[in-house]
Every structure is written in structure tokens, then in C-alpha cells.
Amino acid sequence: MTRKEHKEGMPNDLQGGSRQSMTGRRTFLKGAAVLSAASVLKTGSAMMPAEQAAYDKYNALVIPRPEGLLDGEPVLQVPAPDSMGVAFAVTALANGFAEVADNPEMSNPMRFMAEGMPLAGIDDRVLKVRMTGLKPGTKYWYRAGAAKLEHPIGYWTKPSEIVWSKVHSFMTPGENAPSHFGMMCDTHANFKQMARITKKYRELGVPLMVWNGDIPNSLTNKREDFVKHYLVPPENDGYAADTPIVLNRGNHDFRGTAANRLCEVMMTRLPSERSPRDIALDRNFAIRMGEIALIGLDTGEDKPDHHPANGGFSCFTPYRIAQTAWLKDQFKRPEIANAPYVVAFVHIPLIELWPGANPGTILEDYAVWQKECADMWGPILTENKVQLVLAGHTHRYRYDSATPTRSWAEIIGGGRGNSTFQTLVEGKVENGKLVMRVHNTDAGTIVGEHTFAPRS
């Protein structure tokens, strides 16, 4: 079968150029990029009768358009200056796609296939696609899609037509992106409260959200728990279809037998975004949103590694040490070193909230603040004149000012509880200052506003 024969047998929606990366399967392939949902042609003179029968059976199979294949709207994630990830849930074995264009009409789009090589990451529940080759600080329009897979002959696989989502849009990070971001934390699978946050940040036009830990309520014992929390959260359909999510884990995100399967649902950063030394640090981030550099650090569990709750298989102290070396290197990058504003994200606070507060280094109870991380990271943040750390964990909004020996202030976001309220922490550069507004999304009010001058 020639390439020309294969292309002539393909429906129009599968014939265009397909652009994919080494991890995002990006190459311009004319016609042969995706298996045809229509006929496979082969000259009769080259075929034995049994082989002809197999091809006839393959060609005769007509896969109806699979209704209900897409389970919810796509979820944008792992934003980078030149790439954007998207994951979405499906109801049957399928291959995933995304098309992206620089115009709302979606003319001349680039098409990408589900991440993976040599096999695309087909799945019967979660599909993940990475759009690469993008420009920093640029608005794009995209749609996500899936093709159901059938097996008419043994392992021969035939896809249905692609079922597409609605067209959505996003902004890539970069120095010319809007100087605007948001942070939510400690949602703990309370989807009603989460819906108030997601509604608010969409109303405000926040172009990027950091989900700063403790997304589950308790143990995560199966992958479907992650699917519910991230891809199909009740009352929150479309919450990240136009607003990319940057995930920064909290202590609850490490609990349960499925905790290490998060990567099957939420994508990690490309290996090219970090050095070989830091290959295990696949969720740390350092990106620019306009004048603001955003840096993500993972404080891990709220108990020491030798605590019996960790079962002897955790290694959070070495993990924090590795992040310390990574953090130092981020300030050698010009786009981070030259940023007028730098905001770091941690789940567990880095400031001792009151004398004798549990520092996370003892067996009793659980950490209120993370002394080990504060000792490792705090001096680096101060040395580089970072203005702000955003945290969660305590479920109570709190503001601690900078001091003569500590350059950074700390804002703790609120979380669910009988005597607390959920917050959306919004950061935006206005009139030459970084203005942080803390929204009480339960009451619809602003409970705090804090202003920061550019770094000297």
C-alpha cells in the first residue's frame, strides 16, 4: 500500500498535517499521521484469499459515531512558554487528539496525538495530549477529541471518526503574558465550595491558576478517585477548559494506595524543562506570567519520614534537598532572575505560626509549618529578594509581613471547615505594584489586600 493510496482512503478530517513532539508525538506527517477510519487498500494481485478476506472484513466495519465518548470538558495543565497539556476523560478505549490554532475560527490548526512513543497513550478512561511548538505569551484556541478504537480482526485496530469538544482558548506563560494569576488550596473534594472558586476566577479572567495542594479529602485508593477530583469534578465541568491549572501537591495528595498513580491522570512537566540531575522533580515549576515569576516547591507530607504513617517507604527529606539545588538554579535563569516580582508556592507554610507550633520534624501529631523546608529554602528566597510565599494547609487565611531578615511575606489561603472559609488568592500587577487580593468565595467578599513593590 502506497502512502498516496493510504491518504486517498482517509476521511477528510484525518488527512491534514499532524504536528507532534518526541513526547507529544510532533512531526509533520502528511496523510499517514493517523490510521484511517475508512478503507485500507491493497492490490488484489499481491494478496492471498485469506488475506483478502481479512482486508475486506476490516474495510466493511463501519464504526458508528460514538455518542457520549467524551466525559466532560478538557482540563488544561502543565502550562509552559512553548507547550500546553490537556487531559480529558472518556468512556471507552480511545486515542486522544488536540487541535490548536492562533485564531478562533480554528483555521490551519496543528494536530497532536495522545502523548507516548512508540505507542500513543490510548486508554479507556483518561487521554492526555501535549500541544508543543507554541509561542510564549500568546493566545490560542483549541479543541480536544477522541476516536473510539475497535478490533475487527485480532489485534488490527480501527478508529471511529474523532469526536471533538467545543472550542476553548488559553494563554501560554511568558514575559509578555498578562501579569495575573490565581491560587486555590485545600479544596478536599468539597465540590460545592470548589465551584464557587472556579466561578470566581473565571469571572475575574484569571489566565492561570495554581492548585496549591490537598485536592483529595482522604485516601486515594484507585485511579478513578483522581479522575473524579481533577477531570470530572461534580458541579465544576469546564473549570479548567480555558484556564490552565498548575498542580502543586499537599500532604493529602501523597496518601492512599493510588497516590503514585497521579501521573496517569494529571500530566507532568517535560524532561526538557529541567536538568538530568532534577529528572525526578517532574512537578516543580518556574514560569513567568508577565512581570511575575511563579515558582512551585513541594513540601510533601506533614510528618517526618520515620513516622509509622509513612510505612518506611517515603523519602521526603531527600526530596526537599533535591528541590533546594533545583531552586538555586532557577535564579540563574534570566527570565526568573530579572522578574520584577517573584512568588513562591508551598502547601505547608514556611513560617512558625506561633511559638512551639509543630514543625513537622517530630512524631507527635502533624506539621503546622515546615521547618525543614523553611531552613533549606527560606535563605535562598531571601537572598534573591523574593517578595511573597503563598501557602495553604491550615485552612485559615493569614498574612505575615516580611521582616528585616526575611525578604518575603507569606499569605496562607483558607480552606473548608466549620469555622473557616474557602479563598481565591488573586495576584495582579496594577499601577506598577503587585496587588494580592484574598477573596472569601463563600461570602463573595474581599478579606485582604496586600501590595508589593518590584524587586530592587
Which residues fall in each region the model found?
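Short acidic, glycine-rich surface-loop motifs adjacent to enzyme active sites
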Residues: 334-355
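Extended active-site neighborhood of metal-dependent phosphoesterases/phosphodiesterases
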Residues: 131, 139-169, 224-337, 364-368, ...
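Short S/T/G- and acidic-enriched coil/turn segments that sit immediately N-terminal to beta-strands
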Residues: 124-130
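N-terminal twin-arginine translocation
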Residues: 21-27, 36-62
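Binuclear metal-dependent phosphoesterase catalytic core
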Residues: 61-67, 73-83, 87, 97, ...
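N-terminal secretory signal peptides
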Residues: 1-23, 37, 50
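N-terminal active-site segment of His-dependent metallophosphoesterases
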Residues: 67-72, 78-85, 90-97, 105-123, ...
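Active-site neighborhood of phospho(di)ester-bond hydrolases with catalytic His/Asp-centered motifs
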Residues: 183-185, 209-214, 245-251, 344-346, ...
